[in-house]
Structure formats: C-alpha cells, structure tokens
Amino acid sequence: MIVKVCGITIAEDALASVAAGASVLGFNFYPKSPRYVRPEAARVIADQVSVLRVGVFVNEAPGDVVRIMKIAGMDVAQVYLGALPAGVRTWRARNVDATFDAAELSDPAPEAFLLDAPAPGVHGGTGHMFDWSRVPSVPRKIVLAGGLDASNVARAIAIAKPWGVDACSKLETAPGRKDHKRVRDFIEAAMAVHV
C-alpha cells in the first residue's frame, strides 16, 4: 500500500510526512490551486526527501509538464485533463462523477489511475468523498483520493481495495499547511489495514 500526502508546499511538512511513513509526496503545479508551489521551490523541498515525488497538473501542455517536472525534480506526473506527456511516468487523475466509465481504466499509458471526488471547477484537495464502491476491481494500480483521513481510510481501503491512498485537505490546518498529527494518524490508519 502506498500512502501519498498531497499539497506539499513547505519542507517542514514534507519531512514530517516522510518521517510519519508517507511513501509518496504530491506537489501541485496548477496555478489556480491554493496549494500551488513554484517548480523551483518544489525542487528545494523534493531534494530533501527520498520518497516518490508526484507533480499534479491540470490541463497543462505535455511539453510544459515535462519541463516543470525536470525543474521541480518530480518522478511522476499526475494529470487531470489533457494529454499525457510522453517520456515520463504518469498517473491519470479522474473524478468519479456521473460520466465516469470504468473502461477508461483500460488505457495502458498511465502506470496508475488516481480516482478522486468530483467538485465543479476544482481538481483535488476538496475534502469531498465519493462512493468507494464505484471503484471497479481491475488489474491496474488505483490510488484512492477524496476526503480521506484517519477516520475513514480503513473503510475506504476495505471497500475499494486500492493500490494506494492519497490525502490532502483533511490533513491541513489551512490550504498548503499540514497538521502533523493528522498526517501521522492518517498514515498509521492506512498502513494498519491488510487487504
């Protein structure tokens, strides 16, 4: 089980998340996000950790995704909307809304799919949940996101049986600032589940 703490904006939160057991950190490169971090600032943080570093992109041109990933020192591009860039590891992020079709998960291009809760005009970090029973049983890596925290992650894992889980806003005191106790509690709860 991988555990991703997303919306990292400062080194203190990155280091605390890794110390608590996070195996993946997410950095948001969508300028309209309250958790947006400049690629150069993300690089300073990313260079201090040895876990998987995922850059979050929304409808960004593939060439720009690759350029930002190099500047920021990211390992994987998590892409909401738009084309997947070639030559880099990718996760396709998809909101599980009324238009969600499990057949989309057969696309061989991304190495994983991140399934998130829908919210009009917002891409991740909303704190909203979706019906976890809608996550299909497929032979693909699925990362479950959307309103997860220590109080519900075990139930979400039991229902959806994902490869990984991702949390952001439910671990914060303010957008982009993590509550380290909430981070620890979330990671402990996720890692305690055996599926």
What does each of the following model-derived ranges do?
Residues 1-195:
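Conserved N-terminal beta1-alpha1 strand-loop-helix module at the mouth
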